[in-house]
Amino acid sequence: MPSEILNKARAYEAKHGAAISPAERPAYHMTPYVGWLNDPNGFSYYKGKYHQFYQYNPYDVRWAPMHWGHAVSTDLLHWEYLPCALAPDSPADNGPGCFSGSATEMDDGKQLLMYTSVIAEKQPNGEMRDIQTQSIAIGDGLDYEKPACNPVLTQKDLPEGFSKFDFRDPKIWRETDGTYSAVTVCLAEDGSGAAVLFQSKDGFDWHFVTVLERCNNQYGKMWECPDFFPLDGKQVLMLGPMEMLPKGEFHNGHNVIAFIGSYDEATHTFTKENVQLMDGGIDFYATQTTLAPDGRRIMTAWLQTWSDTEDKPKGCKWFGQTICPRELHIKDGRIVQTPVRELDAVHGKRIFHENVTVQSETSLEGIKDRVADLTVTVQPGEYRSFILKLAADADHHTSLTYDPYTSQLTLDRSYAGSRADIVHTRSCKVRSQNGALKLRILLDKNSIEVFANDGEQTMTAWIYTPQSAQDITFAATGSDVNLTVEQYELNL
């Protein structure tokens, strides 16, 4: 029986979410039914549909005590809203609420949600602090019940010295023998993050197994949103470090990184061999993956970052969205990302320009839109820079600039329309190919996702530009550049 708090949230979203027209939302990126969205949660395939829950405040476009919103899809592009799944309505979570978590299927066909339950607790010095534990809820894909045994993991289940104030974000899965496994993150005794593995035979009674990886103050401070999965013969530990320093390909603040290595299941030993940044853009955090029925490893993420959440469109009825889900593979020891192939099925009218030579700023016939799948292939050459402007008009644009001499690709949304003092420019290094470059760009009203060289690097950003800014232009400095441009309209 849903609680009064949950019923209130469901009634509110049913009234106010239904009042938001499809035209007010992106075409193929998931947004909250109404109000606020941050981390995607419970990304899973269950009863023939993809389920994507999310951190949710239905009542306002800002963070507040967390609920779990809920949506389902058959193609990862069109999302149907279901009633709010979880609310802060139990003794384990009736403070800041139901934080991030995940989902898996149980032996009896029910769906098990595992989430971070948070309450405020008075400390000996009189200070109120949030205490983080892990709880579960069991349901049928629509309604979920929290058992009386919650929380199922607390500080007493952690190694000595690990913090009860920073212990969160369980990612749950089933082993081949049916065992339930979950990786969480916690603040270790050295003041930096650790990824901790727990297991259970039934999903209710959990025990500590091992510390999979420690930050040792090398990759930021506290970690968030862990995931642990096999991929193309390797094992991946993916997570979101906080308070990173700009070393190598990493940038200040929140990042998403992946440790790639091997895993000994008998000893539960993870050995990292490589580490990489998962997105070099501005708005990308809180990743989570699931295994599709056909064996693809598919990733979702929050198309936002915490530092710019106060920069909202005036009068917006919703805030926050998730990326277009991405397929993951390993190539030459690194993860590559491509948009899910379901996007190809909605390709409409094709506009194609082959071997076009440009230098001064140039528009190409038919190449313009704010909802499109665009591929630009730059041939090797002696140009000094290539500049692509998107969502452009006389006053606005977001640019991608490639310097073949440094192999730097720069995303700049300074002229996208925001007046806020936030990060507007990021650069990442792409593989040097004597000036050759391939960019696949997903445009969806107020977002841009860039896949460089078949997904070897990605850059993601939210943009604040009026929808009337539709133009796309091409230019080069130093000498001419030769391009092939392909754009698909999307039949959504």
Label every PLM stretch briefly.
Residues 1-169, 174-218, 230-279, 303-353, ...:
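Beta-rich carbohydrate-recognition and catalytic domains
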Residues 10-15, 257-492:
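Beta-rich accessory regions
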